[in-house]
UniProtKB/Swiss-Prot annotation:
PROSITE patterns in alphabetical order: GLUTAREDOXIN_2
Organism the protein comes from: Bacillus subtilis (strain 168)
EC number: 1.8.4.-
Name the UniProt record assigns to this protein: N-acetyl-S-hydroxy-L-cysteine reductase
Catalytic activity from the UniProt record: N-acetyl-S-hydroxy-L-cysteine + AH2 = N-acetyl-L-cysteine + A + H2O
């Protein structure tokens, strides 16, 4: 399994919390892929199926085909998930 952690941010234009999440990831030096769901109901449908939510931001963190979705609002939830993934990486070394 790859040690590379992939981060995907589901966001939309005009979402201040989405910008806060992206700024936080940039400040911490985490590269991420952004998926803009603005006016794209099919993308929101995917979030509904995967996580039971249609709101953004949703942040996915994972490796390979195993991802954790962070749907809770608050940087503390994202920070905890990032820390957990760092611990997993350290434990595998």
């Amino acid at each position: 399994m790859s040690d590379v952690v992939n981060i995907v941010v589901w966001s939309k234009k005009g979402c201040s919390y989405c910008e806060e999440v992206k700024n936080y990831l940039n400040e911490k030096g985490f590269p991420f892929q952004n998926i803009d769901v603005s006016e794209k109901e099919k993308l929101r449908d995917i979030l509904q199926v995967k996580y039971g939510v249609r709101h953004v931001p949703v942040v996915e963190i994972g490796r390979g085909n195993q991802y954790q979705g962070i749907t809770e609002i608050g940087i503390e939830h994202l920070d905890l998930a990032l820390a957990n993934h760092a611990q997993i990486k350290e434990a595998k070394r």
